[in-house]
Amino acid sequence: MKIVLASKSPRRRELLSNLGLDFEVIESNVEEFSSEKHPSRYVMDLSFNKAMSVAKKLKEEAIVIGADTIVVIEDKVLGKPKDRDEAFIMLKNLQGRVHTVYTGITIVRTKDFKYVSDFEETKVWIKKLEDEEIFNYIDTGEGYDKAGAYAIQGVGALIVEKIEGDYFNVVGLPISKLFDILKREFDVRLL
């Protein structure tokens, strides 16, 4: 069955490619807005909007995967930084503390529009850093298109002290949960 990733995220693309999956990417282009207040419901709502918007456009039978990731610290949602100063403030706020990364995933089968939404959460601790180290990391440029202003799979690995939970969730797609839902709910087997 055709698999479609409803995301422009290069990291999600890379994760699915690393699994050896044959898939197509179709960006959803939906507004990233949800009235949901709880982080898990918020990311599931956004992932649903992305997946369903792409599923409705398809003429052929497919499985559509939508995802959305946010970083939360003390009930404050951190999105992608707008500039260097905002990236510095985010990383300064995250250092020496624990935050939670939430990723919502929604899988839609276009044949009957059956869908399943779920989420994963992972705790991440960022090391205490000198201001110069924070600016040096920001100047790598890799954190600008990522929630929380860092990329655990890149140079950002140097600033992460430890994680508790699914590493791939922090990258942007909880692979194990995706595998389980595809198998259990849609009889799509990746192995």
UniProtKB/Swiss-Prot annotation:
Q: Which GO terms describe its biological process?
A: nucleotide metabolic process
Site positions for Important for substrate specificity = 11, 69, 153
Q: Which Pfam families match?
A: Maf (PF02545)
- What NCBIfam families would the database entry show? maf
Cystine connections:
none
This chain's protein is named dTTP/UTP pyrophosphatase
Example of a GO cellular component annotation carried by this entry:
cytoplasm
E.C. designation(s) = 3.6.1.9
Q: Which cofactor does it need?
A: a divalent metal cation
Name the reaction it catalyses: dTTP + H2O = dTMP + diphosphate + H(+); UTP + H2O = UMP + diphosphate + H(+)
Name the family the entry cites. Belongs to the Maf family. YhdE subfamily.
Quote the function comment for this protein: Nucleoside triphosphate pyrophosphatase that hydrolyzes dTTP and UTP. May have a dual role in cell division arrest and in preventing the incorporation of modified nucleotides into cellular nucleic acids.
Ranges annotated as spanning the membrane: none
Catalytic site positions: 68 (proton acceptor)
Instruction: Kindly list the organism's lineage.
Output: Bacteria, Bacillati, Bacillota, Clostridia, Thermoanaerobacterales
